[in-house]
Regions:
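Conserved beta-alpha structural segments and adjacent helices that either
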Residues: 1-359
Length: 359
């Protein structure tokens, strides 16, 4: 049985049909799905993602668990509909080391949510949710949208890029840079994994493509693009006034799915209470940008709880938090520990086959 067959089997399961009906009932604000162990939760969730019209946000316990869950979903659904929302820091926030790749992923999620795409799936974890994000207004004010066939002056585009803080270079190789060669503008947006190559014909955008940094060769043709700068620097200058909780950024009809609501609250509170290490402060003070501060840029456990209770919630951990409005019980089991003993694996398979399971 391959992944597609497994997913189809889950899609036709009566319990999954029951969950989908409950999620259409607006009176059900808190749903508990018990008995979903290991990747069973991912397979079950993939069906919900395919049928959803609202954003689904899966909040796992930590970065590693979220990474495994994201990998499972992308193996089933692909990467177009499933997004990963990490912390913007390379290690724990208290070390103060920003990660440009993670900031790209975060900005991409915000941009896609801003567009109002149906059935978008976001996988995240408490350390990422502890950090505030830019408000919808701030993101909109700092977003340049272009599409093939659009009439726009090339000089206007470069002026906007400069005003957004993009750095002019000969060759683009990292986010926040742009280059101009004849009628072509290369720009690396903080909302895209790959940089864009915009080809002009006079005052018209003739074509837009992504390209590989290493080879500088074009990769994929795009009909439209969104260019977003590094908003963290501009917000550091303005203070925390343009920042909100990620949950504040979400549409009100979003569904929050999690294993353990109380653990998320406690972990976010821990992240909020941690201070920057002396080494992190010293390192930042020695840079041109000066010392980093986390004041006003993190939410605490209480704020997370307050915001989360505004949304519909689905829990799929060992036990629910409080009394759910509805409960659906699955009957999956934890995989036995085989210790690389293939005889035990074979015996386990034979036993399942004798009980009329499909493998």
């Amino acid at each position: 049985m391959n992944i597609t067959e497994l997913q189809q089997s889950y899609a036709s399961h009566p319990n999954v049909e029951g969950v989908c009906r409950l999620l259409k009932d607006n009176s059900v604000r808190h749903l508990y799905c018990g008995g979903l162990y290991a990747s069973a939760a991912s397979l079950f969730s993939s069906v919900l993602v395919q049928r959803a019209t609202c954003p689904l946000v899966f909040i796992l316990g930590d970065m590693e668990e979220a990474g495994y869950f994201y990998h499972d979903l992308t193996q089933i659904l692909g990467t177009e509909q499933v997004l990963f929302f990490p912390s913007s820091f390379r290690r724990a926030i208290k070390y103060g080391q920003k990660d440009a790749a993670n900031e790209i992923l975060r900005t991409e999620v915000l941009s896609r949510l801003q567009k109002g795409e149906e059935g978008l799936c976001v996988v995240t974890y408490p350390d990422a949710l502890a950090e505030k994000v830019v408000s919808r207004k701030e993101l909109g004010d700092n977003t340049l949208k272009l599409h093939a066939g659009e009439r726009v002056d090339m000089n206007f585009v470069t002026d906007v890029l400069r005003s957004y803080g993009f750095e002019y270079v000969d060759f683009v190789y990292e986010p926040g840079q742009y280059a101009v060669r004849g009628s072509i503008i290369d720009v690396f947006s903080f909302s895209s994994e790959y940089p864009f190559r915009i080809d002009f014909f006079g005052d018209e955008v003739e074509s837009v493509r992504t390209f590989e940094v290493e080879t500088q060769l074009s990769k994929e043709k795009k009909e439209s693009i969104v260019i977003v700068p590094d908003l963290s620097h501009s917000l550091e200058k303005k203070g925390s006034g343009g920042m909100v909780s990620f949950l504040d950024f979400l549409p009100s009809d979003s569904l929050l799915a999690m294993r353990d609501f109380l653990w998320l609250r406690e972990r976010i509170q821990t992240v909020h209470d941690e201070s920057l290490t002396p080494q992190a402060i010293a390192a930042r003070e020695s840079e041109e940008n000066g010392a980093i501060t986390l004041e006003g840029k993190l939410i605490d456990g209480g704020e997370f709880t307050l915001r989360a209770l505004d949304f519909r919630r689905m829990e799929f951990g060992n036990k629910p938090t409080g009394t759910p409005d509805a409960t659906v019980s699955f009957h999956t089991t934890v995989q036995p520990i085989f210790h690389k003993n293939f005889d035990m694996v074979a015996e386990s398979f034979r036993e399942y086959l004798s009980r009329h399971y499909t493998i």
